[in-house]
Each structure stands twice: as structure tokens, then as C-alpha cells.
């Protein structure tokens, strides 16, 4: 661990918490491993930066380790928040659908550039927004920031270059259209706000409507995550039978 040139990656004031896991390895104590790795990094940084003080008051560089079958991998967390955090959903309704799961559902639904997609339980709009971004080839995470953007050894110009490249590959003139409905006006307002933040507000349309009045448009792909008791974390709701037999498609 000491042999890694940490001083080439971490400045003298870097904060560097150590976290990790162990699987099928002789070293099973995570706290002990954290302590050993931390001490090795500290010793190397002190030597590399020629200092006896490491204030850890600067940018955070999360050090992660993974022990698997007695082989240790050391990593720097370049992402920060989970990749499902796209950067456009500042707020969400109760029991929101993860963006990554919504993107997978859009894939399974075979959403294309000219698709018409509807969601009768749109909530904060995640399913339709992810479907729109897929249809328009908008890179996921384009609106968010990553931990490595603050790392001193990664040129800021690299991030700007890649973002410009991703923007250039977006297809904004597609025929895709999405329509979302929800009985809750607050959810509809939130969906509209999220769509605007995601840059797909011209392709995603949301309005207040009761699912009892829903009838899918001809040729529409219906993607939805209907509310149910267990997901909403209510014992009463989970005990009730749920029926959406009145839906017309």
C-alpha cells in the first residue's frame, strides 16, 4: 500500500476517508483494514509532500478497497453520488423509481427515436424522462457533477471536452413524444420541472388526469410503475388487493 505514489494523486490537504469490503478473504475485519490502509497512505503522503501535517481540509478523495479471495484492489471513487443520480431530479414524490431502473424499463420497452410513450401513473416523470433521453441520445449524467471533477490530477478541459462531445451527439430533432398523467397536481408540476431540468420538456407532456379515464393512444408504448402498498410502505395498502382492470389499451 505504501508503494503506491499517493502524492501524485492526492494533494497535501486532501481529505481521504477509507472504506471497503472483504469477501472470501483471510482478512475479515474491515475496521482493521481501514486503519492499516489509512496509515500507509498517511505515511506515503507525508514523505511525498515533505510534511508532517495532513489537515484533510481540502477536496475529498474517497479511497476504496475490495478484498476478494485474498486479492486486494485499491480504488479512488471518481463518481461520488450513485450513478442513478442523473442530476435532473431535484425532488421526487413518495417511493420514486430509480433513474437507472427507469432507463432499463425504457430499453425493455424498445423505445426508439420515433416512439410515442405514455405513463398513466407518471409521478415525478422519471420513466418518461429516461425514455426521452434514450430516444434523443442524451447522455445520462450530463446534468450532474462527478467527484473526479474536483481532483487536481484530472484536467478540467477533459470534462468540458467530453461534455461538448456528448452534447454534439444528442439528437434533438427526433419524432419522439411522451405523455404522462397523474391524479396529483403536485406530481405533475414536479414532472414538468424535472423534464425541463433534463432538457426534454419539449418532448414530455404532463397533465392532471385520473387513471380511470386513461385509454392508450394507438401505437403508444405504455410504460408505468403503478402505486401499490408494499412499495408505498403501508401495511394497510399492502393488504388490499390492487386491480387496474379498468385500464384500456
Language-model regions: role of each:
Residues 215-221:
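A short acidic, Gly/Pro-enriched loop at the edge of an enzyme's catalytic core
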Residues 23-26, 82, 228-231:
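A short, flexible beta-alpha/helix-coil linker loop
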Residues 211-212, 229-241:
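Short, contiguous acidic/charged loop-to-helix segments that flank catalytic cores in large enzymes
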Residues 1-61:
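Non-catalytic nucleic-acid substrate-recognition regions in nucleic-acid-modifying enzymes
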Residues 97-215:
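Conserved S-adenosyl-L-methionine
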Residues 74-108:
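SAM-dependent Rossmann-like transferase core, predominantly class I methyltransferases
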Residues 67-74:
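C-terminal edge-of-domain segments
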Residues 245-249:
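Conserved small/polar residues in nucleotide/adenosyl-binding loops
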Amino acid at each position: 500500500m505504501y508503494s503506491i505514489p499517493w502524492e501524485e494523486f492526492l494533494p497535501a490537504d486532501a481529505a481521504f476517508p477509507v472504506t471497503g469490503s472483504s469477501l472470501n478473504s483471510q482478512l475479515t475485519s474491515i475496521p482493521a483494514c481501514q486503519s492499516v490502509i489509512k496509515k500507509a497512505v498517511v505515511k506515503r503522503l507525508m514523505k511525498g509532500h515533505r510534511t508532517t501535517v495532513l489537515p484533510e481540509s481540502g477536496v475529498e478523495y474517497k479511497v476504496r478497497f475490495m478484498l476478494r479471495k485474498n486479492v486486494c484492489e485499491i480504488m479512488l471513487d471518481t463518481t461520488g453520488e450513485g450513478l442513478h443520480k442523473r442530476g435532473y431530479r431535484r425532488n421526487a414524490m413518495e417511493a420514486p423509481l430509480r433513474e437507472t431502473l427507469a432507463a432499463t424499463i425504457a430499453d425493455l420497452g424498445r423505445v426508439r427515436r420515433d416512439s410515442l410513450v405514455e405513463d398513466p401513473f407518471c409521478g415525478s416523470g422519471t420513466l418518461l424522462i429516461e425514455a426521452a433521453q434514450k430516444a434523443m441520445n442524451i447522455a445520462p449524467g450530463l446534468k450532474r457533477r462527478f467527484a473526479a471533477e474536483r481532483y487536481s490530477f484530472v484536467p478540467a478541459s477533459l470534462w468540458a471536452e467530453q461534455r461538448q462531445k456528448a452534447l454534439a451527439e444528442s439528437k434533438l430533432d427526433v419524432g419522439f413524444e411522451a405523455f404522462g398523467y397523474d391524479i396529483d397536481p403536485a406530481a405533475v408540476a414536479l414532472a414538468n420541472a424535472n423534464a425541463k431540468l433534463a432538457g426534454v420538456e419539449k418532448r414530455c407532456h404532463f397533465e392532471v388526469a385520473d387513471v380511470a379515464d386513461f385509454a392508450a393512444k394507438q401505437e403508444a408504448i405504455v410504460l408505468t410503475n403503478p402505486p401499490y402498498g408494499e412499495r408505498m410502505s403501508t401495511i394497510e395498502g399492502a393488504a388490499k388487493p390492487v386491480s387496474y382492470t379498468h385500464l384500456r389499451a
